[in-house]
Curated annotation (Swiss-Prot):
Residues 1-26 have a biased composition (Polar residues). The lineage of its organism: Eukaryota, Metazoa, Chordata, Craniata, Vertebrata. The gene is POU2F1. Residues 381-440 bind DNA. Belongs to the POU transcription factor family. Class-2 subfamily. GO terms for cellular component: nucleus. It comes from Sus scrofa (Pig). PANTHER family: POU DOMAIN, POU DOMAIN, CLASS 2, TRANSCRIPTION FACTOR 1. GO terms for biological process: negative regulation of DNA-templated transcription; regulation of transcription by RNA polymerase II. The modification Phosphothreonine is found at T270, T276. Residues 280-354 form the POU-specific domain. This is POU domain, class 2, transcription factor 1.
Length: 745
């Protein structure tokens, strides 16, 4: 009986032109490696018959444990020449052929496919070992003889594979078609392997692979089917799958990966396509960032806004873009894809705009009707926003405080001094005036809403038993603090400071206020007057009294009918004096409002005591640091004098022979007047006929031995005391001398 291996050797040596196909679910092709041993036709038919029993369902093979009995009769006579150390080349043929097991290889046991990384590794290995396999075929075609007694299925492609060619024609086209249909039903099951383990032979591997390109597999796989007729090859071409039986040598020396040739350039080109964007993307991002920065600078230089760019692009190129889109492009807040789309359009518009500004030409006929794209439009562009430096702004603020509305010549002078444009200075002053109106809006009555600040000095203690009412050794402060708003003029600040001259004898302190002319008058005597000119009182005393008038910063507008509160330091019994002129208060003002304005308790004053149109003079006790609320009354002739001692009201002790009312402190004597005394010039003849002298009774009884204090209220008319002169003086001499002086006035 002829040995099938002997008949296949000549065909293997000269059968390079014979082609075969190999298929598996992983789309791999393996270079054929011829072996000396071959299987008989009966073995192949039994092998193929067993394929019909394989049930491919789900992710596992139902016939994984089924065995395949292959009847093989090998009469190799050349086994005597093989080395005894090689169990695979023993001359004796075992009587019982072990069964072959059908199993899944590798990841197919769990129904998984090879990952792309594994496929790429196999591709690289196949490319590296392609030439080595070709050399191995030529070297071992004439010498190798192996007995393919058993085979084991494996999905590992990391070892070199040798193929066992079929010596007899086999009609397997229909079987492979069924196999393809079964594999299409279960895509996860890519391949299966037949294994034939033996006790004394290294297991050989049989891989049945399926490739989608059967035609190329026939051209590439050689020495597979040596004696396959043309009909069988045609059936293989039509059905596309092919079969490859490979065996693993006992001592593998190299690794091999078999892949289809046509998938190799695709697999190699795919990483290139993936890597290319990653390599080019950084450069594109840098280019986009640079273009966005350049675009913004050139756009601002041309005088176009982001909204203008969006409208111009819509009219020129038909793509409307909003101002937000242009802003996001400049800020690199758009996606990479959108920025790549927008970049060429913006670049084209920028070039066209620069050509328009430089050459004064139109780049497109549609630009004729586009406002702002022609030469005239460029000239009509709004100017760049002016940024004023800090030092220039400070100088402008100083000029604004001096003159809020300068003339054109003054604006030109300021612009020349600051090296600025005249139009910029003019606009700044206009905007500054509007800002001032927002900060200090004018009221309907034209009054100022800024309050008048009150300043009080530290109090100077005074002995309560001293008959002198005024003793001052330091500068005193006149404080104005309106409770009701001034309606006649806008008074920003009023501060009157009084100083006294100290002599060896008694001194007198006079603070005279002329509201329309000055805001502060300082004098050694106390003489408030609301008249237009400051008035100075002459006090008859043994010592000379000097009068000084000091005018501070003039008011921006006449004080008019304002109210002044005078606080003199060193006063304890009469801590403060509120002096006022004619104030603008409605005639129907309530008593409570006037009393609250005067800082008095409304319960102390009856409505009958307030005649229509009266002026209020309030002397309210308290410490020097306390703030007395001034009273703003209507322009009336009422004079209210409230004199309160630190321990109670001053009692009325006597009236002199001339009809003057004398207030005096009788020491521990009981107080006669327990409530404030109100003197109405319309009802009391004391204020209409003669001046009123308030003299301390204790000082009057002392005669010339001590100084006395007197308050002179001189009325210039019988109906009104609006222009009255109030004098508080500390003079030396007897009470009769003071009374005589009052009569002389």
């Amino acid at each position: 009986m002829n040995n099938p291996s002997e008949t296949s050797k000549p065909s293997m040596e000269s059968g390079d032109s014979n082609t075969g196909t190999q298929t598996n679910g992983l789309d791999f092709q393996k270079q054929p490696v011829p072996v000396g041993g071959a299987i008989s036709t009966a073995q192949a038919q039994a092998f193929l018959g067993h394929l019909h029993q394989v049930q491919l369902a789900g992710t596992s093979l139902q016939a994984a444990a089924q065995s395949l009995n292959v009847q093989s009769k090998s009469n190799e006579e050349s086994g005597d020449s093989q080395q005894p150390s090689q169990p695979s080349q023993q001359p004796s043929v075992q009587a019982a052929i072990p069964q072959t097991q059908l199993m899944l290889a590798g990841g197919q046991i769990t129904g998984l496919t090879l990952t792309p990384a594994q496929q790429q590794l196999l591709l690289q290995q196949a490319q590296a070992q392609a030439q080595l396999l070709a050399a191995a075929v030529q070297q071992h075609s004439a010498s190798q003889q192996h007995s393919a007694a058993g085979a084991t299925i494996s999905a590992s492609a990391a070892t070199p594979m040798t193929q066992i060619p079929l010596s007899q024609p086999i009609q397997i086209a229909q079987d492979l078609q069924q196999l393809q249909q079964l594999q299409q039903q279960n895509l996860n099951l890519q391949q299966f392997v037949l294994g034939h383990p033996t006790t004394n032979l290294q297991p050989a591997q049989f891989i049945i692979s399926q490739t989608p390109q059967g035609q190329q597999g026939l051209l590439q796989a050689q020495n597979l089917l040596t004696q396959l007729p043309q009909q069988s090859q045609a059936n293989l071409l039509q059905s596309q799958p092919s079969i490859t039986l490979t065996s693993q040598p006992a001592t593998p020396t190299r690794t091999i990966a078999a892949t289809p040739i046509q998938t190799l350039p695709q697999s190699q080109s795919t990483p290139k396509r993936i890597d290319t964007p990653s390599l080019e993307e950084p450069s594109d991002l840098e280019e986009l960032e640079q273009f966005a920065k350049t675009f913004k600078q050139r756009r601002i230089k041309l005088g176009f806004t982001q909204g203008d760019v969006g409208l111009a692009m819509g009219k020129l190129y038909g793509n409307d873009f909003s101002q937000t889109t242009i802003s996001r492009f400049e800020a690199l807040n758009l996606s990479f894809k959108n920025m790549c789309k927008l970049k060429p359009l913006l670049e084209k518009w920028l070039n066209d705009a620069e050509n328009l500004s430089s050459d004064s030409a139109l780049c497109s006929p549609s630009a004729l009707n586009s406002p702002g794209l022609g030469v005239e439009g460029l000239n009509r562009r709004r100017k760049k926003r002016t940024s004023i430096e800090t030092n220039i702004r400070v100088a402008l603020e100083k000029s604004f405080l001096e003159n809020q509305k300068p003339t054109s010549e003054e604006i030109t002078m300021i612009a020349d001094q600051l090296n600025m444009e005249k139009e910029v200075i003019r606009v700044w002053f206009c905007n500054r005036r509007q800002k001032e109106k927002r900060i200090n809006p004018p009221s309907s009555g034209g009054t100022s809403s800024s309050p008048i600040k009150a300043i009080f000095p530290s109090p100077t203690s005074l002995v309560g038993t001293t008959p002198s009412l005024v003793t001052s050794s330091a500068a005193t402060t006149l404080t104005v603090n309106p409770v009701l708003p001034l309606t006649s003029a806008a008074v920003t600040n009023l501060s009157v400071t009084g100083t006294t001259d100290t002599t060896s004898n008694n001194t007198a302190t006079v603070i005279s206020t002329a509201p329309p002319a000055s805001s502060a008058v300082t004098s050694p005597s106390l003489s408030p007057s609301p008249s237009a000119s400051g008035s100075t009182s002459e006090v008859s005393s043994a010592s000379e009294t000097s009068t000084t008038q000091t005018t501070s910063t003039p008011l921006s507008s006449p004080l008019g009918t304002s109210q002044v509160m005078v606080t003199a330091s060193g006063l304890q019994t009469a801590a403060a004096a509120a002096l006022q002129g004619a104030a603008q208060l409605p005639a129907n003002a309530s008593l409570a409002a006037m009393a609250a304005a005067a800082g008095l308790n409304p319960g102390l004053m009856a409505p009958s005591q307030f005649a229509a149109g009266g002026a209020l003079l309030s002397l309210n006790p308290g410490t020097l640091g306390g703030a007395l609320s001034p009273a703003l009354m209507s322009n009336s002739t009422l004079a209210t004098i409230q004199a309160l001692a630190s321990g109670g009201s001053l009692p009325i002790t006597s009236l002199d022979a001339t009809g003057n009312l004398v207030f005096g402190n009788a020491g521990g004597a009981p107080n006669i007047v327990t409530a404030p005394l109100f003197l109405n010039p319309q009802n009391l003849s004391l204020l209409t006929s003669n001046p009123v002298s308030l003299v301390s009774a204790a000082a009057a009884s002392a005669g010339n031995s001590g100084p006395v204090a007197s308050l002179h209220a001189t009325s210039t008319s019988a109906e009104s005391i609006q222009n009255s002169l109030f004098t508080v003086a500390s003079a030396s001499g007897a009470a009769s001398t003071t009374t005589t002086a009052s009569k002389a006035q």
